[in-house]
Design a protein with these regions (language model features):
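Generic helix N-cap/helix-start motif at coil->alpha-helix transitions
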Residues: 2-10, 33-42, 67-77, 86, ...
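Alpha-helical segment of the N-proximal tetratricopeptide repeat
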Residues: 7-26, 42, 49, 184-201, ...
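Residue-level recognition of tetratricopeptide repeat
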Residues: 13, 45, 80, 115, ...
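Structural motif corresponding to the intra-repeat A-B loop/turn of tetratricopeptide repeats
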Residues: 18, 50, 85-86, 120, ...
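Hydrophobic/aromatic packing residues within the alpha-helices of TPR/SEL1-like helical repeat arrays
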Residues: 28, 60, 93, 156-159, ...
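Catalytic glycan-binding domains that act on GlcNAc-containing polysaccharides
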Residues: 322, 343, 350-353, 357, ...
Length: 675
């Protein structure tokens, strides 16, 4: 803990915030030495910004040993000054990259190193102690050295290690323009491009290759060609390539992979009979994998062979049944076949939240409304049920006690009973009344939490000298969180000071202080504290401009990136809206432009509005299409019906990732209900 010192002159902070660095330097010159760490930091920044990086280092070196918690901020400033002098920033950044360092410090140090590697001499990069780097940075350094040094072998080594990160995509994009590689190497490059979302580049690379002769190489060429065509929406060409892959497959693994991809193409194309045969072929090749079972069971129901599907379940391996069983039961309920759905549900472990949720749907479909309410109460009170709880609430019909007032309560089980029997509005009102009577929560509900008194530490010291952005980005963990009121202040302050993901986390921690309360039961007055208006302001503006439902866009962005403009996924998706490179091309922007948060939000809002126009006012379909693609979702609706019950559609979705995604988006929509 830094020892208490007199607060700095407010004029210093005002000058820092306004970027008047000459004034900062002049004010600092009048202060007694030694300078407190925060003032030493802004003095050094003033020197660096005014073109005196050597002077900045002179200020930082004596201050660093007594910097305490501010050492990370001072090391980062030292690294920037070293870079300005053309020096290697590694000596300043190395301590911040060790595992004990807080994640924000590691991220900031990594970002500084990435910039340094673009400009420092190649010899300097080659001298970086790679073993001291985290694995991801080690790979990025290898790519930087390979690209700048024209070293094909080093770039290929990055691909040989793994293909699902940003370093692999950068290496593959560079290698794609190089010449003289054998076919097997070209295929490895194409694979990395596909995984990284650069589908068109992969397709062009594959199209330039002559058909290989050796069976295993020919299989990989045909399979990757089929995947690229599928991703680009060219289903006839995908089918042709995948048929070639199936014809030359020499192992069960190859037959499984090709059959799964070819079955998806057939199903999307509306050829259910062929798709069923392909799903069965996948199941025969790999009977302990989910995909073959799932597709075969689903299409048997679609083709009117539900009894056969239920019979097959008896031979399903237990780990597979946990996944495909709920999907089959949901598909049967979508077809209004509760008797067979019950048979399937009886074979599924009832501790699964989705199985219990489908049990409520089954009871309602068979007219057992009171039994359904009782089952819903148990589910609603169980935090392990997650976002399935909101889906159950949407299922329940109004009861005789609907909207009747309930006494104030914060008890999760009591709130569950109120919601199931008197409705969501009554449960919200009961919780709101209980919180309003609690001094720890009343000011949170009023949306006016003041700055906590007695707040100290690194983040506070940085804010006192006008470095609020650094306080939020480097020390979000040092913000007050002792009481609900402090958490509400922290959530709003973090976003105002420039750290939206940390603000979202603080708001969600505030929600967690209520225990196992579903998002649907949160009082509207509490929602701005959990999801601050400043956090979603960009979404609100973009959605209104593009004609998209505001809560839908908020829910999607919350799930896609947690409002992080620098987010990058293993699938190559970039930025706050998580578009892949091919989507950027379709939308008329470059991948680099997707890192512009406001631009990306407008593009996302346009996509949501377009999908809503295609699928109508149905959040599940729109969110699923944003995640899995509209062609895929259209094929599901062709099988499940154009207006399926939302809960059943989510549970029946063949893609587990998409099902979870839609549930999370729906939860976010509840949180954004005040907008």
């Amino acid at each position: 803990m830094i020892q208490a010192v007199p607060p700095p002159d407010p004029a210093v902070a005002e000058a820092v915030r306004a970027g008047r660095w000459a004034e900062v330097r002049a004010l600092a010159a009048t202060l007694p030495r030694p300078l407190p760490p925060a003032l030493a930091l802004v003095t050094a920044r003033a020197a660096r910004t005014l073109g005196e990086p050597a002077r900045a280092l002179e200020v930082l070196r004596p201050a660093l040993p007594r910097a305490g918690e501010l050492a990370a901020a001072m090391r980062l400033e030292g690294a920037e000054a070293a870079l300005a002098l053309g020096q290697d920033p590694w000596p300043y950044l190395a301590p911040l990259l060790s595992p004990p360092s807080p994640a924000p410090h590691r991220r900031a140090a990594a970002a500084c190193l990435r910039r340094a590697w673009q400009t420092l001499p190649l010899a300097t990069l080659q001298g970086v102690p790679r073993r001291s780097l985290p694995r991801s940075l080690r790979r990025e350094l290898a790519v930087a050295i390979a690209v700048r040094g024209g070293n094909d072998a080093a770039a290929l080594h990055v691909l040989a290690e793994r293909v699902n990160d940003e370093a692999a995509l950068r290496a593959a994009q560079w290698l794609a323009g190089r010449q003289g590689f054998p076919t097997t190497t070209r295929l490895a490059i194409a694979d990395a491009l596909l995984v990284g979302g650069a589908w068109r580049e992969a397709d062009e690379l594959l199209a330039a290759l002559p058909p290989p002769i050796e069976p295993r190489v020919r299989f990989r060429w045909a399979f990757l060609t089929g995947r690229a065509a599928y991703r680009l929406g060219d289903l006839p060409r995908a089918a042709e390539a995948l048929d070639r892959a199936l014809a030359v497959a020499t192992s069960d693994e190859e037959r499984f992979a090709a059959a799964v991809q070819r079955a998806r193409v057939a199903e999307i194309s509306g050829d259910e009979a062929s798709a069923l045969g392909l799903w069965d072929a996948a199941r025969a090749a790999q009977p302990r994998e989910v995909e073959g079972w799932d597709g075969g069971l689903r299409l048997r129901v679609v083709l009117g062979r539900a009894g056969e599907a239920v019979g097959l379940v008896r031979g399903c391996p237990a780990p597979v049944l946990r996944v495909v069983g709920p999907r089959l039961a949901a598909t049967l309920l979508l077809r209004h076949d509760p008797a067979r759905a019950r048979v399937v549900l009886d074979r599924i472990p009832q501790k699964l939240a989705v199985a219990r949720t489908l049990g409520v749907a089954l009871l309602l479909q068979t007219g057992q409304v009171e039994a359904a309410r009782s089952a819903a109460v148990v589910l609603l009170a169980d935090p392990r049920a997650g976002a399935w709880r909101e889906q159950v609430l949407a299922l329940l019909p109004p009861g005789a006690e609907e909207n009747q007032p309930a006494p104030p309560t914060r008890d999760g089980e009591v709130l569950a009973r109120i919601a199931a029997r008197r409705g969501v509005a009554a449960a919200r009102a009961a919780l709101a009344s209980a919180l309003a009577a609690d001094p720890a929560w009343d000011r949170v509900l009023a949306c006016a939490p003041p700055e906590p008194t007695g707040w100290t530490g690194a983040a506070h010291d940085l804010a006192e000298v006008g470095l609020e952005r650094e306080a939020a980005s480097l020390y979000p963990f040092a913000f007050p969180d002792g009481s609900p009121e402090e958490l509400a202040w922290t959530a709003r302050t973090l976003v105002v000071w420039g750290n939206p993901p940390a603000a979202l986390s603080a708001g969600e921690r505030l929600w967690g202080r209520l225990g196992a309360v579903s998002a649907a039961l949160l009082p509207e007055a509490l929602l701005p504290a959990i999801l601050p208006p400043e956090l979603v302001a960009g979404c609100v503006a973009a959605a209104r401009e593009q004609g998209a439902p505001v809560p839908w866009l908020v829910g999607i962005i919350r799930q896609e990136s947690r409002f992080d403009a620098d987010a990058y996924s293993l699938a190559g998706a970039v930025g706050v809206a998580q578009f892949v490179p091919e989507a950027a091309r379709r939308l008329g922007v470059t991948p680099a432009e997707l890192k512009d948060g406001d631009r990306a939000l407008r593009l996302a809002a346009r996509e949501v509005a377009r999908l809503a126009e295609r699928f109508g006012p149905r959040l599940a379909q729109v969110a699923a299409a944003y995640n899995a693609g509209e062609t895929v979702v259209a094929s599901w609706l062709a099988e499940f019906g154009s207006e399926p019950e939302e809960l059943l559609l989510i549970a029946a979705m063949p893609y587990g990732e998409t099902s979870g995604y839609v549930l999370a988006v729906r939860e976010g929509v509840w949180l954004a209900g005040y907008l």
